[in-house]
Protein backbone atom coordinates (compact mmCIF):
# COMPACT_ATOMS: atom_id res chain seq x y z
CA UNK A 1 0.00 0.00 0.00
CA UNK A 2 1.69 3.14 -1.20
CA UNK A 3 -0.68 5.51 0.55
CA UNK A 4 -3.58 4.86 -1.82
CA UNK A 5 -6.80 6.68 -1.00
CA UNK A 6 -9.03 3.96 -2.43
CA UNK A 7 -9.14 1.23 -5.07
CA UNK A 8 -9.56 3.77 -7.87
CA UNK A 9 -6.38 5.53 -6.74
CA UNK A 10 -4.59 2.15 -6.80
CA UNK A 11 -5.88 1.47 -10.33
CA UNK A 12 -4.85 4.93 -11.51
CA UNK A 13 -1.22 3.77 -11.32
CA UNK A 14 -1.88 1.00 -13.90
CA UNK A 15 -1.29 1.32 -17.62
CA UNK A 16 -4.59 1.95 -19.37
CA UNK A 17 -5.13 -1.52 -20.87
CA UNK A 18 -4.48 -3.33 -17.58
CA UNK A 19 -6.69 -0.89 -15.68
CA UNK A 20 -9.54 -1.54 -18.14
CA UNK A 21 -9.16 -5.31 -17.66
CA UNK A 22 -9.51 -5.03 -13.88
CA UNK A 23 -12.53 -2.72 -14.20
CA UNK A 24 -14.12 -5.15 -16.64
CA UNK A 25 -13.66 -8.05 -14.20
CA UNK A 26 -15.15 -6.05 -11.34
CA UNK A 27 -18.05 -4.82 -13.47
CA UNK A 28 -19.00 -8.40 -14.38
CA UNK A 29 -19.30 -9.24 -10.68
CA UNK A 30 -21.33 -6.07 -9.98
CA UNK A 31 -23.70 -6.78 -12.87
CA UNK A 32 -24.42 -10.17 -11.33
CA UNK A 33 -25.54 -8.26 -8.23
CA UNK A 34 -22.88 -9.90 -6.07
CA UNK A 35 -22.13 -7.89 -2.95
CA UNK A 36 -19.56 -8.30 -0.20
CA UNK A 37 -19.62 -8.12 3.58
CA UNK A 38 -16.83 -8.31 6.14
CA UNK A 39 -17.25 -10.40 9.28
CA UNK A 40 -15.00 -10.24 12.33
CA UNK A 41 -15.71 -11.75 15.77
CA UNK A 42 -16.43 -14.95 13.88
CA UNK A 43 -19.01 -17.27 15.45
CA UNK A 44 -19.04 -21.06 15.11
CA UNK A 45 -21.96 -20.76 12.68
CA UNK A 46 -19.91 -18.44 10.44
CA UNK A 47 -16.94 -20.83 10.61
CA UNK A 48 -19.26 -23.68 9.59
CA UNK A 49 -20.36 -21.78 6.48
CA UNK A 50 -16.81 -20.71 5.60
CA UNK A 51 -15.62 -24.30 5.96
CA UNK A 52 -18.33 -25.57 3.62
CA UNK A 53 -17.05 -23.23 0.89
CA UNK A 54 -13.41 -24.11 1.65
CA UNK A 55 -14.14 -27.87 1.48
CA UNK A 56 -16.08 -27.51 -1.79
CA UNK A 57 -12.99 -26.02 -3.44
CA UNK A 58 -11.15 -29.29 -2.77
CA UNK A 59 -14.13 -31.52 -3.57
CA UNK A 60 -14.33 -30.04 -7.09
CA UNK A 61 -10.81 -31.39 -7.71
CA UNK A 62 -11.62 -34.76 -6.15
CA UNK A 63 -9.58 -34.00 -3.04
CA UNK A 64 -10.19 -33.74 0.67
CA UNK A 65 -9.40 -30.47 2.47
CA UNK A 66 -6.13 -30.67 4.36
CA UNK A 67 -7.32 -28.41 7.20
CA UNK A 68 -10.21 -29.29 9.51
CA UNK A 69 -13.12 -27.21 10.71
CA UNK A 70 -11.73 -27.53 14.25
CA UNK A 71 -8.43 -26.02 13.04
CA UNK A 72 -10.20 -22.93 11.73
CA UNK A 73 -12.26 -22.53 14.89
CA UNK A 74 -9.00 -22.48 16.89
CA UNK A 75 -7.97 -19.35 14.95
CA UNK A 76 -10.53 -17.10 16.64
CA UNK A 77 -7.90 -15.59 18.98
CA UNK A 78 -6.00 -14.29 15.94
CA UNK A 79 -8.90 -11.93 15.17
CA UNK A 80 -9.32 -13.01 11.53
CA UNK A 81 -11.71 -11.44 9.03
CA UNK A 82 -13.91 -13.33 6.60
CA UNK A 83 -15.21 -11.55 3.52
CA UNK A 84 -18.37 -13.18 2.19
CA UNK A 85 -19.65 -12.75 -1.35
CA UNK A 86 -23.42 -12.91 -1.42
CA UNK A 87 -26.04 -12.95 -4.13
CA UNK A 88 -29.82 -12.96 -3.77
CA UNK A 89 -29.45 -12.90 0.04
CA UNK A 90 -27.28 -16.05 0.10
CA UNK A 91 -23.55 -16.32 0.69
CA UNK A 92 -21.86 -17.93 -2.29
CA UNK A 93 -18.14 -17.55 -1.50
CA UNK A 94 -15.77 -16.50 1.26
CA UNK A 95 -12.14 -15.52 1.78
CA UNK A 96 -10.21 -15.59 5.06
CA UNK A 97 -7.81 -12.83 6.07
CA UNK A 98 -5.38 -12.39 8.95
CA UNK A 99 -3.66 -9.23 10.07
CA UNK A 100 -0.49 -8.16 11.83
CA UNK A 101 0.47 -4.65 12.86
CA UNK A 102 1.31 -3.64 9.27
CA UNK A 103 0.21 -6.49 6.98
CA UNK A 104 -3.05 -8.01 5.80
CA UNK A 105 -2.72 -11.68 4.82
CA UNK A 106 -5.18 -13.42 2.49
CA UNK A 107 -4.96 -17.18 2.88
CA UNK A 108 -7.95 -19.46 2.30
CA UNK A 109 -11.08 -19.22 0.22
CA UNK A 110 -13.91 -21.27 -1.16
CA UNK A 111 -17.06 -20.90 -3.25
CA UNK A 112 -20.40 -22.62 -3.67
CA UNK A 113 -20.70 -21.44 -7.28
CA UNK A 114 -18.09 -21.35 -10.02
CA UNK A 115 -18.32 -17.77 -11.30
CA UNK A 116 -15.75 -16.06 -13.52
CA UNK A 117 -13.57 -13.58 -11.63
CA UNK A 118 -15.28 -14.26 -8.28
CA UNK A 119 -12.00 -15.57 -6.85
CA UNK A 120 -10.12 -12.45 -7.92
CA UNK A 121 -12.78 -10.13 -6.53
CA UNK A 122 -13.24 -11.93 -3.21
CA UNK A 123 -9.59 -12.69 -2.48
CA UNK A 124 -7.68 -9.88 -4.16
CA UNK A 125 -9.79 -6.81 -4.93
CA UNK A 126 -11.75 -6.93 -1.69
CA UNK A 127 -8.46 -7.56 0.13
CA UNK A 128 -6.85 -4.55 -1.56
CA UNK A 129 -9.82 -2.40 -0.56
CA UNK A 130 -9.59 -3.65 3.02
CA UNK A 131 -5.83 -3.02 3.18
CA UNK A 132 -6.28 0.53 1.87
CA UNK A 133 -9.27 1.23 4.13
CA UNK A 134 -7.49 -0.02 7.26
CA UNK A 135 -4.16 1.52 6.20
CA UNK A 136 -2.12 -1.66 6.20
CA UNK A 137 1.34 -1.11 4.77
CA UNK A 138 1.29 -4.46 2.96
CA UNK A 139 -1.22 -6.92 1.57
CA UNK A 140 0.16 -10.45 1.19
CA UNK A 141 -2.25 -12.58 -0.89
CA UNK A 142 -0.13 -15.73 -0.59
CA UNK A 143 2.67 -17.39 -2.48
CA UNK A 144 2.69 -18.16 -6.21
CA UNK A 145 0.35 -17.20 -8.98
CA UNK A 146 1.35 -15.52 -12.23
CA UNK A 147 -2.17 -14.03 -12.31
CA UNK A 148 -1.33 -11.91 -9.24
CA UNK A 149 1.32 -9.91 -11.11
CA UNK A 150 -1.11 -8.40 -13.62
CA UNK A 151 -3.39 -7.44 -10.72
CA UNK A 152 -0.69 -5.29 -9.15
CA UNK A 153 0.91 -7.65 -6.64
CA UNK A 154 4.63 -7.05 -6.77
CA UNK A 155 6.81 -10.15 -6.51
CA UNK A 156 8.79 -10.70 -3.33
CA UNK A 157 11.25 -13.42 -2.47
CA UNK A 158 10.09 -15.49 0.48
CA UNK A 159 11.81 -18.12 2.57
CA UNK A 160 10.69 -21.19 4.42
CA UNK A 161 12.74 -23.12 6.93
CA UNK A 162 12.94 -26.89 7.27
CA UNK A 163 15.07 -29.37 9.15
CA UNK A 164 15.83 -32.61 7.35
CA UNK A 165 16.97 -35.40 9.67
CA UNK A 166 18.71 -37.58 7.05
CA UNK A 167 22.10 -35.95 6.33
CA UNK A 168 22.40 -37.33 2.77
CA UNK A 169 18.93 -36.13 1.92
CA UNK A 170 19.68 -32.79 3.60
CA UNK A 171 22.82 -32.34 1.42
CA UNK A 172 20.91 -33.18 -1.77
CA UNK A 173 18.16 -30.70 -0.89
CA UNK A 174 20.71 -28.02 0.00
CA UNK A 175 22.43 -28.44 -3.39
CA UNK A 176 19.09 -28.27 -5.18
CA UNK A 177 18.14 -25.08 -3.30
CA UNK A 178 21.44 -23.42 -4.23
CA UNK A 179 20.82 -24.20 -7.91
CA UNK A 180 17.15 -23.23 -7.71
CA UNK A 181 17.97 -19.85 -6.14
CA UNK A 182 19.62 -18.76 -9.40
CA UNK A 183 16.45 -19.59 -11.33
CA UNK A 184 14.32 -17.81 -8.74
CA UNK A 185 16.43 -14.66 -9.06
CA UNK A 186 16.00 -14.71 -12.84
CA UNK A 187 12.25 -15.30 -12.55
CA UNK A 188 11.98 -12.48 -10.02
CA UNK A 189 13.58 -10.02 -12.46
CA UNK A 190 11.30 -11.19 -15.28
CA UNK A 191 8.23 -10.92 -13.04
CA UNK A 192 9.05 -7.29 -12.21
CA UNK A 193 8.86 -6.48 -15.93
CA UNK A 194 5.30 -7.80 -16.20
CA UNK A 195 3.80 -5.52 -13.53
CA UNK A 196 0.92 -3.35 -14.78
CA UNK A 197 2.12 -0.05 -13.34
CA UNK A 198 2.92 2.94 -15.52
CA UNK A 199 6.31 3.56 -13.88
CA UNK A 200 7.62 0.00 -14.41
Describe each model-derived feature in a short phrase.
Residues 101-167, 174:
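Acyl-donor binding region in acyl/amide transferases
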Amino acid sequence: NKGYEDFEDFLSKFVSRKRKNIKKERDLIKRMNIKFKKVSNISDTVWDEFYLFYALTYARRGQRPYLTLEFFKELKNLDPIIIFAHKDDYNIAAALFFKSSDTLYGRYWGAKEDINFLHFETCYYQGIELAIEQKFKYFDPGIQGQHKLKRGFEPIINSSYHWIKNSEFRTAIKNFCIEESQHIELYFKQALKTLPFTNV
